[in-house]
From Swiss-Prot:
Presence of keyword Thylakoid: yes
Keywords: Membrane, NAD, NADP, Plastoquinone, Quinone, Thylakoid, Translocase, Transmembrane, Transmembrane helix
HAMAP family hit by this protein: NDH1_NuoH (MF_01350)
Chemical reaction(s) catalysed: a plastoquinone + NADH + (n+1) H(+)(in) = a plastoquinol + NAD(+) + n H(+)(out); a plastoquinone + NADPH + (n+1) H(+)(in) = a plastoquinol + NADP(+) + n H(+)(out)
Localization (cell): Cellular thylakoid membrane
Official protein name in the record: NAD(P)H-quinone oxidoreductase subunit 1
Subunit structure: NDH-1 is composed of at least 11 different subunits.
Family affiliation: Belongs to the complex I subunit 1 family.
Membrane protein topology class: Multi-pass membrane protein
NCBIfam families hit by this protein: PRK06076.1-2, PRK06076.1-5
GO cellular component: plasma membrane-derived thylakoid membrane
Functional note: NDH-1 shuttles electrons from an unknown electron donor, via FMN and iron-sulfur (Fe-S) centers, to quinones in the respiratory and/or the photosynthetic chain. The immediate electron acceptor for the enzyme in this species is believed to be plastoquinone. Couples the redox reaction to proton translocation, and thus conserves the redox energy in a proton gradient.
Length: 373
């Protein structure tokens, strides 16, 4: 657990100066680290998630799965990407070519931009803005426009139905998701993702928001799965009903963009759950214990470098545990009907999220120390 009063960037600089580097060189070495980490995490996250999807689905269906492209098939996602890259880019004769091309871009760009506010460590993020969570909700609201645009521009009835379903589903689940996040913001007194994690670093695992917001956690996770269009909520691209939904007429790299956006969004949602409810980079034990074991002061560079590195691994570990659960759900649960999907969002999750928000406000007034008063 990194103490909120300590600066990982400063500790890194001090550690580099201990090796004889000047402060300016240490600063230059630090600058690319947050951006590099985010880019690597997004790309590797997609590759690992696709590989996990293939292997877990094979295990559920008692198959071997990918095994020839690298050891245990780890290079299969790269092979899939190269295959889509070299395929012909086809635009249907009667499709609106401009909207047809713009649709996938509007779907994938907001997801990638959302990684700007994701913290992997105390200062390991690209943009620590004060309204980080608000920005993420705003970016995610752009996606339904791209999905509806893709379905409409394809000039295909299955694509149009898929686009309409995607837009309806996204709008239905964005509201309870935002209300669940608002309860966390209320307890943290901040919209910054860094502040939200720091608020969970008082007593190790017992400080995590999941214990104070179990209902909000379930609401957020269900809504996140619906936003990612994962089973049992993959109505927009239900193969048995709509061929491939809004993706029906797409091929090559345009289809790959939808594929990419889906998996980046899945990993992003898992990391956000880790940040909002599972303590983010926080380690389950207090940092003081590690400092005592190393016989170092709590603000020693070596202590902060170790806790920072472990914190990054903790964030990724928590996120991939949730990715594993999402993949397992896809291959073990049946798809719901569209009316059941909308009823769950509007008639159950939305009222439950409102009640959870009101209860959180009451608890904040009654127990200000425990609930961030």
């Amino acid at each position: 657990m990194v103490s909120p009063g300590l600066d990982l960037e400063l500790s890194f600089s001090q550690a580099m100066q201990g090796f004889g580097l000047s402060p300016e060189v240490a600063r230059l070495l630090w600058l690319p680290l947050p951006m590099l980490l985010v880019l690597v995490a997004a790309v590797v996250g997609v590759l690992v998630s696709v590989w996990l999807e293939r292997k877990i689905s094979a295990a559920v269906q008692q198959r071997v799965g990918p095994e020839y492209a690298g050891a245990l098939g780890v290079l299969q996602p790269l092979a899939d990407g190269l295959k889509l890259l070299v395929k012909e880019d086809i635009i249907p004769a009667r499709a609106d070519s401009i909207l047809f091309t713009l649709g996938p871009i509007l779907v994938v760009v907001p997801v990638i931009v959302s990684w700007l506010i994701i913290p992997f460590g105390q200062n390991l993020l690209i943009s620590n803005v004060g309204v980080g969570i608000f920005l993420w909700i705003a970016f995610s609201s752009v996606q339904p426009i791209g999905l509806l645009m893709s379905g409409y521009a394809s000039n295909n009835k299955y694509s149009l139905l898929g686009g309409l379903r995607a837009a309806a589903q996204s709008i239905s689940y964005e509201i309870p998701l935002a209300l669940a996040v608002l309860a966390i913001v209320m307890m943290s007194n901040s919209l910054s993702t860094v502040d939200i994690v720091n608020q969970q670093t008082g007593a190790g695992i017992l400080s995590w928001n999941i214990w104070r917001q179990p209902v909000g956690f379930l609401i957020f996770w269900i809504c996140a799965l619906a936003e990612c269009e994962r089973l049992p909520f993959d109505l927009p691209e239900a193969e048995e009903e709509l061929v491939a939904g809004y993706q029906t007429e797409y091929a090559g790299m345009k289809f790959a963009l939808f594929y990419l956006a889906g998996y980046i969004n899945l990993v992003l949602s898992a990391v956000l759950v880790s940040v909002l409810y599972l303590g983010g980079w926080g380690f389950p034990i207090p940092v003081e214990w590690l400092a005592d074991w190393l016989h170092q002061p709590i603000d020693a560079p070596v202590v902060q470098v170790i806790t920072g590195s472990v914190g990054i691994m903790m964030t990724i570990l928590k996120a991939y545990l949730l990715v594993f659960i999402a993949i397992l759900l896809r291959w073990t649960t049946p798809r719901v009907r569209i009316d059941q999907l909308l009823d769950l969002g509007w008639k159950f999750l939305l009222p439950l999220a409102l009640v959870n928000l009101l209860v959180t406000a009451a608890l904040k007034l009654a127990f200000p120390v425990a609930f961030g008063g």
